[in-house]
């Protein structure tokens, strides 16, 4: 084979070298293509809101659409959604049929049970050891030592609920939040 360059110190690319490079490139492309789904599996899906929050999800894992949600939930209703860090979080419907500006983390501060909302008694009652919380999640009867944690709940532009961390003063106790 003749060289295309005028310099004798530039080796030419032989047919064998070209086929070897082609084979290595094909093998590398196939390997990378096979690794793509494996790598994608380990990266969590982005479900965040604009401000670093988490979009609330229902029991089936679907995003909660506020307009649909308010058609099936009335004022004073509290229902569970998947919130920050995957914790069950109550979405609160206000008296004027809007979503409250806060959500209530449903994890009991005593031993970590999920605390259900008792509509008949208008309070949260822990089934594990009897702790009770008022409608805002403030502890009213032990053995739980602290009130339920709060999160900010905001309706996004695309009509979904975004939960973000609550770092301000706890409006129920006028103290710094213990969970922040």
Swiss-Prot record:
It is an enzyme of class 7 (translocase). CDD domains: Rieske_cytochrome_b6f (cd03471). It is a single-pass membrane protein. Keywords: 2Fe-2S, Disulfide bond, Electron transport, Iron, Iron-sulfur, Membrane, Metal-binding, Thylakoid, Translocase, Transmembrane, Transmembrane helix, Transport. GO terms for molecular function: 2 iron, 2 sulfur cluster binding; electron transporter, transferring electrons within cytochrome b6/f complex of photosystem II activity; metal ion binding; monooxygenase activity; oxidoreductase activity, acting on paired donors, with incorporation or reduction of molecular oxygen; plastoquinol--plastocyanin reductase activity. Its cofactor is [2Fe-2S] cluster. It is found in: Cellular thylakoid membrane. InterPro entries: Cyt_b6_f_Rieske, Rieske_2Fe-2S, Rieske_2Fe-2S_sf, Rieske_Fe-S_prot, Rieske_Fe-S_prot_C. One of its GO terms (biological process) is photosynthesis. [2Fe-2S] cluster binds at residues 108, 110, 126, 129. Disulfide bonds join 113-128. It comes from the Bacteria. Its main location: membrane. Binds 1 [2Fe-2S] cluster per subunit. Belongs to the Rieske iron-sulfur protein family. This is Cytochrome b6-f complex iron-sulfur subunit. It comes from Picosynechococcus sp. (strain ATCC 27264 / PCC 7002 / PR-6).
């Amino acid at each position: 084979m003749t060289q295309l360059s005028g310099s004798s110190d530039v080796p030419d690319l032989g047919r064998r070298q070209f086929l070897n490079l082609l084979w290595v490139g094909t093998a590398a492309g196939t390997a990378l293509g096979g690794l793509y789904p494996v790598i994608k599996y380990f990266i969590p899906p982005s479900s965040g809101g604009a401000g670093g929050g988490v979009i609330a999800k229902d029991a089936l894992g679907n995003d909660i659409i506020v307009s649909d949600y308010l058609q099936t939930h009335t004022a004073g209703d509290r229902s569970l959604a998947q919130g920050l860090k995957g914790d069950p979080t109550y979405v609160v419907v206000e008296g004027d049929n809007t979503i409250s500006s806060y959500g209530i983390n449903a994890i009991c501060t005593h031993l970590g049970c999920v605390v259900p909302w008792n509509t008949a008694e208008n309070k949260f009652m822990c089934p594990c050891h009897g702790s009770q919380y008022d409608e805002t999640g403030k502890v009213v009867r032990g053995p739980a030592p602290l009130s339920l944690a709060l999160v900010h709940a905001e309706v996004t532009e695309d009509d979904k609920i975004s939960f973000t961390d609550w770092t301000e003063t706890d409006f129920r106790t006028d103290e710094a939040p213990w969970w922040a």
